[in-house]
UniProtKB/Swiss-Prot annotation:
Residues 1-18 form the signal peptide. This is Chorion class A protein Ld12. Keywords: Repeat, Signal. The keyword Repeat applies.
């Protein structure tokens, strides 16, 4: 085998490896070996043993204070917002969000979207529209 043929075989091997590395993620390999999970980002003892609920940035409910009792929650619950996203969004991997995420508006998808997962939204109305007129309305959970 001459050096040019060997070079072509090596380039082809690199191209095949590059193509197949884009089709799979590392999550399947890492999950079987215990690399993710346990003390990872999505557990109650998350990033650095405690930056996610119930020990860190998720509120004061564990310390005896009710969440949003004084109308100081992250999501007010009323309003209108429009977000438009156009184009292809190739996303692969694991996403973990710790803390409070203010979500305002609605999400609308058009077209074919293949997705899996779960979303939980909880809070109280902090805009003065509660049953008492100053943000102490009934809590909601979606």
């Amino acid at each position: 085998m001459n050096s040019f043929a060997l070079l072509l075989v090596c380039i082809q091997a690199c191209l095949v490896q590059s193509v197949f590395s884009q089709c799979t993620s590392r999550a399947a390999v890492a999950a079987d070996r215990g690399i993710i999970g346990g003390y990872g980002l999505g557990t109650p003892c998350g990033l650095g043993y405690g930056l996610e609920a119930p020990y860190g940035r998720a509120g004061y409910a564990d310390y005896g204070y009710p969440a949003g009792a004084y109308g100081i929650d992250a999501y007010g619950g009323i309003g209108e917002g429009n977000v438009a996203v156009a184009g292809e969004l190739p996303v692969a991997g694991t996403t973990a969000v710790a803390g409070q995420v203010p979500i305002m508006g609605a999400v609308k998808f058009g077209g074919d979207v293949c997705a899996a997962g779960s979303v939980s939204i909880a809070g109280k109305c902090a805009c003065g529209c509660g049953e008492y007129g100053y943000g102490l309305g009934a809590p909601y959970l979606y």
